[in-house]
């Protein structure tokens, strides 16, 4: 008899929809959650994996006639986040100068290593995994930004809103652009920020979730040596779309070309990278902008003219 009951139960189809309701008011917080094993199983089986082929077209026609040196990397990192660091006030650098230097040092040919000048960012996959039981309403907002860009709207590479109710949430961003290894603020090129909305779920010192991420990038000797895969700016697996959503960066629609515009084309400009020569005057070390012979001559004439004007004023006062 027990076997027939088990058989009947196994034939009962699972509900396709989950019910998730909660109430938050002055009386307190109340949560009612129900789900099916099918969706939960899908999310639990979702793997964090990223290959260079996911981001780059490796077999790419050589750019121009220059010999290209390209070194592909996929970096993996994981760390736990304290509940006090989930308010969106901090950022996580996904690529750092020290990391790039470490990979550059692995290039044995010093001559080739000295030519590497660019970092091509192909893809970043981020996995957030809860350190608490499944079934707790735990919304989280995330964004990957290029923090070197001062305009906040333009800095967004991709944004996501999810929930750790099933234990984890995952998405992938495809930056598909290049920066110099000499960039002064390289550590801010890929900055991950997050805001966990249940910041009262635990107390300071408690690790609320872990962040695991994979970054696929290439080190190369040219800005023109990489071909990226055709991908949307940000993607989310279908299974995670049931508990969250992603937003791509906006693409500006250009205004019609203005009827008139201007640009300064005056002579006497200094070349890019120009550094003024230091001079010592009255015990002061000065770094004045070097002037061309023509501008120096013009300055001398102006100084003579000023002295003549001053002398005329003094003579008038005497008379």
Swiss-Prot record:
Originating species: Carnation etched ring virus (CERV)
Segments for region (Disordered): 1-20
Primary site of residence: host cell
Protein's UniProt keywords contain Transport: yes
Protein name: Movement protein
GO terms for biological process, alphabetical: transport of virus in host, cell to cell
InterPro entries (alphabetical): Caulimoviridae_Movement (IPR051596), Viral_movement (IPR028919)
SUBUNIT field: Homotrimer, through the coiled-coil domain. Interacts with VAP.
Residues making up the signal peptide according to the UniProt record: none
Location relative to the cell: Host cell junction, Host plasmodesma
Keywords: Coiled coil, Host cell junction, Transport, Viral movement protein
Highest taxon of source: Viruses
Role summary: Transports viral genome to neighboring plant cells directly through plasmosdesmata, without any budding. The movement protein allows efficient cell to cell propagation, by bypassing the host cell wall barrier. Acts by forming tubules structures that increase the size exclusion limit (SEL) of plasmodesmata, thereby allowing viral ribonucleocapsids to spread directly to neighboring cells.
Entry's family note: Belongs to the caulimoviridae movement protein family.
This protein's GO CC annotations: host cell plasmodesma
Entry coiled-coil feature ranges: 289-319
